[in-house]
């Protein structure tokens, strides 16, 4: 039986949705390469996760860097922000009067995307909050630094099903120690691991010849 201490990182579902190979290189092979976008994003998350900034504004309680775990997904991680709104249908919180409805807020450096990678990470956080607080979390929000706008996300059954399916696949691949092959596409240009992944290698009819050619080019 897997211990919660050994659960995979919840943030990995965003990597997994973007590219399964990228996820494996980061979370399985422990490889990482930072570019300007990832560095700026890391600094942004450092600010979000300052737990000393927990605050209360009237009927709104803001918790930063809140640790969450989902036994159903076998994922764990930190929510950038969880907003607790005072609500008669909410849940009780230790040390707080009244009832509170949780809503996760994920912070991202760029702008809203067509794919659901960011939304799936938010959904996984919500599913973890539901397990921990025994409540229903039907919505969340993503704040995009580049546009300075929040995107409201409805946590639909379809999004939840996709999150569960991906979490299951992540755990299976991790247990096998398997790194998927590259599937080159436009998304590779935005990937910080492009030089480690070598997606161009998988587009060659003869990968061995491709490697020999580039080794010879770099030879003194």
Predicted regions: what is each one?
Residues 1-104, 204, 213-220:
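Metal-dependent nuclease catalytic cores that hydrolyze phosphodiester bonds in DNA/RNA
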Residues 3-6, 169-185:
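Short, intrinsically disordered, charge-biased short linear motifs at domain edges
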Residues 9, 17-21, 121, 159-166, ...:
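Alpha-helical structural motif
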Residues 16, 27, 162, 166-169, ...:
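Residues that form generic nucleotide/phosphate-binding pockets
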Residues 19, 178-220:
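Cysteine-cluster motifs in flexible loop/terminal segments that predominantly coordinate metals
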Residues 77, 83-177, 189, 193-195:
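Nucleic-acid nuclease catalytic cores
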């Amino acid at each position: 039986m897997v211990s919660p201490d050994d659960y995979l990182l919840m943030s990995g579902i965003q990597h997994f949705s973007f590219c399964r190979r990228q996820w494996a290189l980061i979370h399985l092979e422990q490889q990482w390469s930072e570019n300007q976008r990832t560095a700026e994003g890391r600094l942004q998350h450092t600010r979000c996760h300052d737990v000393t900034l927990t605050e209360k504004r009237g009927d709104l309680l803001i918790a930063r860097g809140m640790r969450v775990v989902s036994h159903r997904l076998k994922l764990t991680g930190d929510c950038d922000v969880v907003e607790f709104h005072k609500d008669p249908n909410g849940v009780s919180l230790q040390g707080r009067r009244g009832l509170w409805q949780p809503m996760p807020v994920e912070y991202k450096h760029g702008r809203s995307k067509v794919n659901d990678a960011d939304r799936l990470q938010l959904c996984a956080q919500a599913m973890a909050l539901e397990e921990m607080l025994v409540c229903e979390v039907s919505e969340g929000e993503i704040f995009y630094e580049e546009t300075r706008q929040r995107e409201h996300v409805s946590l639909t059954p379809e999004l939840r099903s996709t999150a569960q399916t991906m979490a299951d696949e992540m755990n299976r691949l991790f247990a096998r120690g398997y790194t998927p092959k590259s599937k080159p596409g436009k998304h590779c240009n935005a990937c910080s691991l492009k030089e480690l992944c070598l997606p161009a290698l998988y587009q060659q009819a003869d990968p061995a010849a491709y490697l020999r050619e580039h080794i010879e080019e770099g030879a003194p």
